Design a protein with these regions (language model features):
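Terminal, regulation- and interaction-focused segments at domain boundaries
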Residues: 1-34
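Phosphate-end processing signature that detects enzymes handling 5′-triphosphorylated RNA
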Residues: 7, 37, 67
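Solvent-exposed residues in well-ordered beta-strands and their adjoining turns
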Residues: 9-13, 48, 62, 71-73
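Intrinsically disordered, low-complexity acidic/polar segments
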Residues: 15, 54, 77-79
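Ser/Thr-rich, low-complexity intrinsically disordered terminal regions
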Residues: 22-23, 27-63
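C-terminal structural segments of small proteins and small subunits
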Residues: 64-96
Length: 98
């Protein structure tokens, strides 16, 4: 079960939603050193070093929503609320609200 689980409705085409999800993943890669890869309609990501070390997760895209599931290592759970707020802000910026 994910430590953080956020679903955001969208009114985009699936292809456009996938492009937006990739923008989100690239931002995590640039800022946190997270590695990511597409597996079907899902981006799987993890961090093996840096401030986000131990973080794993998935960004799933379907025709009506984008879902972000993040598993935080024990030490980062203390700032779960901050991380969740930042993910929501980034989703607002990249995907918007339907």
């Amino acid at each position: 079960m994910a430590t953080i689980d956020i679903r955001r409705a969208h009114a985009l085409s699936t292809d456009e939603a996938k492009k937006k999800a990739e923008t989100l993943a690239r931002g995590m890669e640039d800022k946190l050193g997270i590695k990511w890869r597409w597996e079907g309609d899902r981006i799987k990501f993890d961090a093996t070093s840096g401030a986000a070390k131990g973080v794993t997760g998935v960004v799933s895209v379907d025709p009506k929503s984008v879902r972000v599931e993040i598993d935080l290592p024990f030490l980062l759970r203390a700032i779960k609320g901050t991380i969740e707020s930042r993910v929501n802000e980034k989703l607002d910026e990249v995907i918007g609200r339907a």
